[in-house]
Amino acid sequence: MRELEAKATKDVERNLSRDLVQEEEQLMEEKKKKKDDKKKKEAAQKKATEQKIKVPEQIKPSVSQPQPANSDNGTSTATSTNNNAKRATASNQQPPPPQQQQPQQEQQQQQPQALPRYPREVPPRFRHQEHKQLLKRGQHFPVIAANLGSAVKVLNSQSESSAVTNQQPQNNGEVQNSKSQSDINHNTSGSHYENCQRGPVSSTSDCSTSCKNAVNDLLEKEAWPSAPGSDPELAPECIDADSASNSESERNITVMASGNTGGEKDGLRNSTGLGSQSKFVVGSSSNNVGHGSSTGPWGFPHGALISTCQVSVDAPESKPESSNNRMNAWGTVSSSSNGGLNPSTLNSASNHGAWPVLENNGLALKGPVGSGSSGINIQCSTIGQMPNNQNINSKVSGSSTHGTWGSLQETCEPEVSGTQKVSFSGQPQNITTETTGPNNTTNFMTSSLPNSGSVQNNELPTSNPGAWRVSTMNHPQIQAPSVMNGTSLSHLSNGESKTGGSYGTTWGAYGSNYSGDKCAGPNGQANGDTVNATLMQPGINGPMGTNFQVNTNKGGGVWEPGTVNSQSSPWGSGNGANSGGSRRGWGSPAQNTGTGLSSVEWNKLPSNQHSNDSANGNGKKLTNGWKSTEEDDQGSATSQTNEQNSVWAKAGGTVESDGSAESTGRLEEKVTGESQSRDRRKIDQHTLLQSIVNRTDLDPRVLSNSGWGQTPIKQNTAWDTETSPRGERKTDNGTEAWGSSATQTFNSGACTDKTSPNSNDTSSVSGWGDPKPTLRWGDSKGSNCQGGWEDDSAATGMIKSNQWGGCKEDKSTWNDSQKSKQGWGDGQKSSQGWSISAGDNWGESSRSNHWGEANKKSSSGGSDSDRSISGWNELGKTSSFTWGNNINPNNSSGWDESSKPNSSQGWGDPPKCNQSLGWGDSSKPVSSPDWNKQQDIVGSWGIPPATSKPPGTGWLGGPIPAPAKEEEPTGWEEPSPESIRRKMEIDDGTSAWGDPSKYNYKNVNMWNKNIPEASGRSDQQAQMHRLLPAASAVSSKETSSGSGWGEPWAEPSTPATTVDNGTSAWGKPIDSGPSWGEPITAASNASTWGSSSVGPQSLSKSGPKSMQDGWCGDDMPLPGSRPTGWEEEEDVEIGMWNSNSSQELNSSLNWPPYTKKMSSKGLSGKKRRRERGMMKGGNKQEDAWINPFVKQFSNISFSRDSPEENVQSNKMDLSGGMLQDKRMEIDKHSLNIGDYNRTVGKGPGSRPQISKESSMERNPYFDKNGNPNMFGVGNTAAQPRGMQQPPAQPLSSSQPNLRAQVPPPLLSPQVPVSLLKYAPNNGGLNPLFGPQQVAMLNQLSQLNQLSQISQLQRLLAQQQRAQSQRSAPSANRQQQDQQGRPLSVQQQMMQQSRQLDPSLLVKQQTPPSQQPLHQPAMKSFLDNVMPHTTPELQKGPSPVNAFSNFPIGLNSNLNVNMDMNSIKEPQSRLRKWTTVDSMSVNTSLDQNSSKHGAISSGFRLEESPFVPYDFMNSSTSPASPPGSIGDGWPRAKSPNGSSSVNWPPEFRPGEPWKGYPNIDPETDPYVTPGSVINSLSINTVREVDHLRDRNSGSSSSLNTTLPSTSAWSSIRASNYNVPLSSTAQSTSARNSDSKLTWSPGSVTNTSLAHELWKVPLPPKNITAPSRPPPGLTGQKPPLSTWDNSPLRVGGGWGNSDARYTPGSSWGESSSGRITNWLVLKNLTPQIDGSTLRTLCMQHGPLITFHLNLPHGNALVRYSSKEEVVKAQKSLHMCVLGNTTILAEFASEEEISRFFAQSQSLTPSPGWQSLGSSQSRLGSLDCSHSFSSRTDVNHWNGAGLSGANCGDLHGTSLWGTPHYSTSLWGPPSSDPRGISSPSPINAFLSVDHLGGGGESM
């Protein structure tokens, strides 16, 4: 291995040398140019640096003259880092291979030149910190630097710390490659030091040991917290050379290095590994190390890194602690990361938690914030990346790391364990880049990467790229990654990278090559240049890196794919994760990382932060730090932001180049001089970019990514215009967002602190710091912006300036606009800052467009936009994400959370509320609120626009405009005009792009020009939202999105506002949409980016056009974005409707399909959205719009369909022509799906749609409930829904058909209601209905849809074909319009699937004739798409989960789709459902359970006969459990599906339900607890009854249960909240809900209850209580009671509901199966048994009186049924003591069970008999629990089923706490669990828990 590694390393080094040589020439020129500037600035910075940190000087020499160590040296370097001085020498002494040496030396020489720049770039403070750490570690780093050469130069430029960083990362790579490598590294680099540093490397036992010991000690000592304090210990041992301050600084760096290097397996692994890290980590994050370096979780040195960051020691002890925490958080998160998905999640979560923590850490770093920032960034990035790098990397390796990075992780995770390791290295490169961004770290990282690259190349060339790639998403392209990895990697890396111009490509290649690039690109040269690029890339990866990745991925070609994923990952996925890494800041990570980080970090950080931390700024910065720093660093520091902007704008690739070393350099450069930067950027970037495939392949995309279309270059130029911050910023405009972003990022004001030290530079990182500026920019922004930002970061400022700086101006606008955002700035700082930052950065990344676009585009470009979005989404979204999740995952949560708080806090602090909320708020629903929100925000941002007012306000300044716009939901109207304007702008947009000045911020709009109206804006918003929440928000928010970024945005915003037009504009948008639409089609998918290749390709092709067109095209992808924008707009319009939705959708959608969809849908979708949104939002326009839209769509049914179809095709882009078919094909084929995947991140195709749908449909709920996974889930949900939606679409398309399709029962009786209700789901008619209704309608629709799915799918497919034929003819804009319409239609379908609103409403009118078509189409669509989508959906599951959070919100579609798609056996699941493979389904459901609580289990499980029905129902249930399940009527009504059929006859109160007669739990083999649950209402009842029947032999039990179910359904409907398991919950959840519902109104329940429950009307049911289930019936008493706590809590309902739900006694038992047994439930331990017995005896002699108070139940046996009945009537709802007794009839079976259980199981057994029934119920529940996993969650306690299932499934909620005993004991005691004493247990009863459970 070592040999291979050595070989690979050598090869890589040679390649790198060559590359470096080549690039050096370029770089030399550039650097020479920059050198002067740098020197000048450096002189100033040096002063600052010196003042801040003395170490840098010490380090610089070493670094400056580091000999190119072998990759192996990297480790030692890393190790060395601990003792920089010595090590540096040692490392330096280690001669790299001659080839390497020379190039490296050359680069080093150059680097020194660069260094000045870097310092300028990175605020001295950061620089110093990093330097310190780096220096110490830098000892080796220098070696690495040598290896990196260029990187080193960069490092040098950055400062020694950078060098160190670079070197270490190389180590990392190497180490990652293998421990041997580490050893080698150690050996190579003064092993003693190295080991020490490395910790992991044992060869250098003394040092290593010392470090380890120190680290361990520290860890043990909780050095983490005191890491800084302990650092010294470490420092002495591990960091001899480090001075305390140096130690700290270095520590950070070291940590970073370590993280990177240490990150290597060993390093990371060992705490020691963290040794170096330790030091680094220790100092910073010993904790990390501690973590096991974190390693465990941090595993990835995330922790370490993070810690490091934290520990940048600025906030030495406290920080570290924080760090620790954070670290831990990271750790934890990291763990997740390790976990893999978690990467994304991690990113999201981690990012959130961790990242933020990280950030915090970073903050802690504070000192290094400048460099630390870098470091942090790096670290953060690094962490993200490093972690990526690291070994966690090693472990999850890339995955993990990436995981950390999240996305990458995601991506990579599996992919490269081994590979990944390297990958991480790669990631480290990313990190490096990041560092670069940050200065040091990036470089450092870069170095690492190169080494890594080398190593990776050696070890895993594939890995590396994989890493990167993988990381990059290579995983998605793992395939690619492999190829890329191995081959490409190396080659790419080397060659391509080289090729790439690698840098440029670097982006492109980079990703692919990344490693190789690094590696190959001779460490020195490649590093230098590549590093530049690469570095940049990594940084970007962080920020750009990912992008780079994108580029990279893309760049190589990879860019597209890889990028997509990679980028996607980073952006999208990565994003999610990395995007986390790469832009982790940007995309996802911003989403994740960024998001998390940013979000969280932002959120958290800011809030937390460490901002406060010593490095307040730091903290904040970090906070932003991540975003900011990270982003900034990544972006900014690296100039990436700017550069990225530029680069992004340029191409991302460009940035890469520019931004890699360039980044570094560029950063430096930027710092040095914008012009130079620009020049360089232009030169390097352009040269590289252009030179590189990047340019060619990537270029369009990159350009697109840049969101600048071709113009991007111009934009670049504009960027170039950068000169004045303003100018630049203006240029930044679109970029601005970017710029802003950077700024924003910087904004993160916390950074300001960082900055504080110098800040401005720090600005860069600091720049973030500059957040002060941010603040400034918030407040001062202008000045800062200009001066401050720009100045502030002079270079960095510049960068930022560029980014922010310009932005600043803009920001000013922002500022102004946002002014505050000043808060933004200020408080926002993060808020905005991050918004912007992230957003911006993102935005930047997105460049707003870029991101947005890129986001989308980039994303797209990596598809990731989507991903990014996803990432954003989420993450998370999708991530986000997941943003991730985020995301979200992201992610969402992270984002969400993060954002949320963040928002609150960080994001905008100021907006904080708003923003957070603002974004958040608005977004709030969304979760990520931030991002999700962002997405939401889009809603927020976007929404903010809608909501935005506040958010806008939140946006503060910006928002102000936004608010105006925001004001808008109506505001959209204003935009409407603008929309019109925009429309022209759209055309213009492209043009405008060229001439941003034209729009000045219109530019941004311009960007958005794509969004014709709010399109651009929205787009941006979306993008921005996503990207830049700030931008978006600002934009969106600010300008309503409309405002655009700032005022400028605002102006555009207006256009955005146009969104109103949005709808009106819709037409236009359609126009536009088509405009971009075409592009959408082309671009759209270019946008797809999901298809990305195609799309982007298309895009590219189209791009120009699109770009031209849009930018349309370009933006087209944006369409996703746009759509996002649209969506967003829509969101906004929707009033935030969708903020999520929009955004989410957008995001999700963003991902191309949606994008497509959105795009078109943007029109249609938007309209729909709007309809929905309006409805939902109740926005004025929406209603109006909706009707028109409905009409329109009806009229255009074709169009509507078309868009939908397009969406479906996901290829709107593709051919514009009906890609729908294609999409189906594509979906069928993974291509599209892959595309989707990329786009969505996971089954993007599915997800996005779902997202959209869910967002839309669920949005309200979603926002409320599940914003969280808006992206992920949303996407997934949307997609699946999309899948389903197509059916809806057909509905939409053939409205009459839909109607015809819809069974008369459903439509006729309900059309109005159901439509209306659907509308609510849709949001279009939403205003008319409450969530409950909507949920019910949703379910109906879903039932319809599900049942019709096959038909619809078939039909859809047919229609799509027809439409595509139709559309195809009009290929081109009109076609696009049509396609857009089809997209819209499709989206609508999707929406309708969710909503069935238009479907029912509009489509219901569709002649039946189409029905058949639809069904088949749907079916084929599902089959085709779903199956293919399945894997993705499976990926999307988490999204589903998110949806699960809001099960109801998920529509059936979501559930169904999710189940079908997301769930692992999507199609088969469908089939299973169809086939009613209960177990299978259940299992599936279990799997899904987390996805969709309801749908999982009960959903399809139930009965084949009703499968369609059930399927629908379940699906519906989950999606809109209330209607469907609870009432069941929705099912009944909505049996639209032919299968659904007649739905079991509606229950009529008083009569036994006749539904599912065929299913007799007793006899039905399929009946399982889950199965029962499947048909919640009916089935469940029945099944429950059957269960009961099984026990009792009577079906009354089941019936009894059912009412609950039914009721639940209702309840659920009511409680939309509980939605998750509508099916699953129906029993359980229902119980819970039922309680609520019933409590509140059990009328329906009652009837249903009677029927379902078969509650003998005569017994209790007949009685007044009969209406509601008896238990619930006692609504009055129980009502309060139930309602009280248990009810809702679950405990409550658990109590009564569960109790009665089993209904065993009351309902069922009573009826038919009345035995002589009476079960008294809901007893509390306080009940006096004797009194109870006396009461019971009043009705007759008691043959048996078994009191099981622990379970809250008692079994009473009378001698006759008459007595039992009498007793039941008397006792039921009898208030005894503090409880209301629920008396139910129990069957003998139940009784036996009850006793058996009481004996065998927990107290539950007492109730066993009852339990029997309940067990059934429980079964149901159980099943539901799966189903309801979410619910379970939601349910937590309430999740009866959760409990059951939990037990069974481990749904931990219930844990099987068995509340039984306790829970049962006091029903209320466990509100969460079924307080009802016995119900749960009864439900869970042994039978079910044991037997039932088993059966489950």
UniProtKB/Swiss-Prot annotation:
Compositionally biased intervals (Low complexity): 69-93, 101-113, 430-443, 858-871, 1143-1163, 1284-1296, 1360-1376
Subunit organization: Interacts with AGO2. Interacts with AGO1, AGO3 and AGO4. Interacts with CNOT1; the interaction is direct and mediates the association with the CCR4-NOT complex. Interacts with ZC3H12A. Interacts with SND1. Interacts with GARRE1.
Function: Plays a role in RNA-mediated gene silencing by both micro-RNAs (miRNAs) and short interfering RNAs (siRNAs). Required for miRNA-dependent repression of translation and for siRNA-dependent endonucleolytic cleavage of complementary mRNAs by argonaute family proteins. As a scaffolding protein, associates with argonaute proteins bound to partially complementary mRNAs, and can simultaneously recruit CCR4-NOT and PAN deadenylase complexes.
Keyword check for Cytoplasm: yes
Keyword Cytoplasm listed: yes
Region (Sufficient for interaction with AGO1, AGO3 and AGO4): 239-488
Annotated region described as Disordered, given as residue ranges: 1-137, 159-209, 222-250, 257-276, 396-461, 548-683, 703-998, 1011-1126, 1143-1182, 1234-1256, 1273-1306, 1360-1395, 1512-1570, 1659-1685
Knockout or disruption consequences: Development up until embryonic stage 9.5 dpc is normal. After this point, mortality rates increase rapidly with less than 5% survival at stage 12.5 dpc. The yolk sac endoderm is abnormally thin with fewer mitotic cells. In addition there are fewer blood islands in the yolk sac, associated with impaired hematopoiesis. Expression of many miRNA-regulated genes in the yolk sac is abnormal, and in particular there is marked derepression of genes involved in regulation of apoptosis and the cell cycle. miRNA biogenesis is not affected.
Polar residues composition bias: residue spans: 396-410, 417-429, 444-461, 591-617, 635-647, 703-722, 738-766, 876-906, 924-937, 1033-1042, 1054-1064, 1082-1105
Phosphothreonine found at: T1406
InterPro entries: Argonaute_hook_dom, GW182_domain, Nucleotide-bd_a/b_plait_sf, RBD_domain_sf, TNRC6_PABC-bd, TNRC6A_RRM
Superkingdom to which the source organism belongs: Eukaryota
Bias kind Gly residues: ranges: 573-584
Pfam families associated with the record: Ago_hook, TNRC6-PABC_bdg
Region Sufficient for interaction with AGO2, annotated ranges: 255-331, 303-384, 325-424, 394-480, 487-736, 1059-1129, 1605-1896
A single MF term (Gene Ontology): RNA binding
Family as reported in the entry's similarity comment: Belongs to the GW182 family.
Protein name, UniProt field: Trinucleotide repeat-containing gene 6A protein
Modified sites of kind Phosphoserine: S724, S863, S976, S1197, S1255, S1520, S1804, S1825
Residue ranges of every copy of the RRM domain listed in the record: 1716-1788
This protein's GO CC annotations: cytosol; Golgi apparatus; nucleoplasm; P-body; perinuclear region of cytoplasm; RISC complex
Protein's GO biological process: cellular response to starvation; endoderm development; maintenance of protein location in cell; miRNA-mediated gene silencing by inhibition of translation; P-body assembly; positive regulation of nuclear-transcribed mRNA catabolic process, deadenylation-dependent decay; positive regulation of nuclear-transcribed mRNA poly(A) tail shortening; regulatory ncRNA-mediated gene silencing
Basic and acidic residues compositional bias, start-end: 1-21, 39-57, 665-683, 723-733
Subcellular location per the Swiss-Prot or TrEMBL entry: Cytoplasm, P-body
